């Protein structure tokens, strides 16, 4: 019982992050063209073939990370991959925010959830949200490392 109580914060953080990645990936499944349009809306210079590849693979990467987070499998590697994906998303949304691009981040389909959450789809809102999620990954890493030392 004591071991479960000690692990509860890590479990909660894994589930929260897992749900975020599940929602993001699920909303993009079968939406390759809208995802591709979102990638182009960031106005970054990448080859068309790479943009198309990202649009096709990204939902599956997000879903895989969700499953790994839920299951707690390959934990340090899953956290590193999650941090890398979030860092890339943060860099993209931050540059769009800095350049004052009036775009939807393409992270989720907030319209299906509630219009009040639309602010989280703006580049500024998405950047702040991603920084919060990155801090949760950092906290999860710290909890994992601390538990391994103890």
What are the residue ranges of the model-derived segments?
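Short, surface-exposed linear patches
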Residues: 43, 52, 62, 91-93, ...
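Hydrophobic alpha-helical transmembrane segments
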Residues: 53-77
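Extended, low-polarity transmembrane helix blocks
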Residues: 1-30, 71-150
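Short hydrophobic/aromatic-rich motifs at helix boundaries and adjacent loops
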Residues: 7-11, 37-40, 63
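Solvent-exposed, well-ordered loop and adjacent helix/strand elements within mature globular domains
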Residues: 24-58
């Amino acid at each position: 019982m004591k071991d479960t109580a000690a692990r509860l914060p890590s479990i909660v953080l894994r589930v929260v992050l897992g749900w975020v990645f599940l929602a993001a990936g699920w909303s993009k499944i079968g939406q390759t063209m809208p995802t591709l349009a979102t990638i182009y809306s960031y106005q970054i210079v990448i080859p068309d073939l790479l943009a198309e590849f990202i649009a096709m693979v990204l939902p599956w990467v997000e879903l895989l990370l969700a499953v790994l987070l839920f299951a707690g499998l390959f934990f340090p590697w899953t956290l590193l991959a999650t941090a890398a994906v979030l860092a890339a998303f943060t860099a993209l949304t931050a540059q769009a925010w800095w350049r004052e691009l009036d775009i939807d981040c393409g992270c989720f389909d907030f319209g299906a959830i509630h219009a009040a959450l639309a602010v989280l789809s703006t580049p500024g809102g998405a950047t702040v949200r991603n920084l919060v999620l990155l801090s949760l990954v950092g906290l999860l890493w710290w909890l994992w490392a601390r538990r391994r030392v103890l």
